[in-house]
Design a protein with these regions (language model features):
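Beta-rich globular "head" domains
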Residues: 1-26, 84-88
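Noncatalytic modules at the cell exterior or secretory-pathway interfaces
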Residues: 5-7, 55-75
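Short, surface-exposed beta-strand/loop "edge" segments at domain boundaries and coil↔beta transitions
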Residues: 16-17, 28-30, 72-74
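Surface-exposed loop/edge segments in extracytoplasmic proteins
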Residues: 28-38
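Short proline/glycine- and polar residue-rich coil/turn motifs
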Residues: 37-46
């Protein structure tokens, strides 16, 4: 089954987080755990947004300005939104 490692995305400028369904069946090292998404700290227009199984294991060089929590495969309403991106996974 695919393993989802993270998301690369361009952050938008809207102040609310749209609902994002990553996958119906997400498998990986911590499927039952709460995940976090890290935003680059430089403000609107940032191009890096990374989602990881481990809330503390963000991509090197990204300063985490805020966190949005989601459980399982659904992202909850939160602090930042309006992004396009793609899921990084392996087969």
């Amino acid at each position: 089954q695919p393993k989802v490692y993270g998301v690369y995305a361009k952050k938008g400028t809207v102040a609310t987080l749209d609902f994002l369904k990553v996958a119906d069946d997400v498998t990986g090292p911590a499927t039952a755990a709460t995940w976090k998404i890290g935003l680059n700290a430089t403000g609107a227009g940032d191009e890096v947004m990374y989602l990881n199984y481990n809330p503390t294991a963000y991509v090197s060089g990204i300063a985490v300005a805020s966190h949005t929590t989601f459980t399982g495969a659904t992202l909850s309403t939160g602090a930042a939104t309006g992004f396009d991106g793609f899921v990084i996974y392996s087969l």
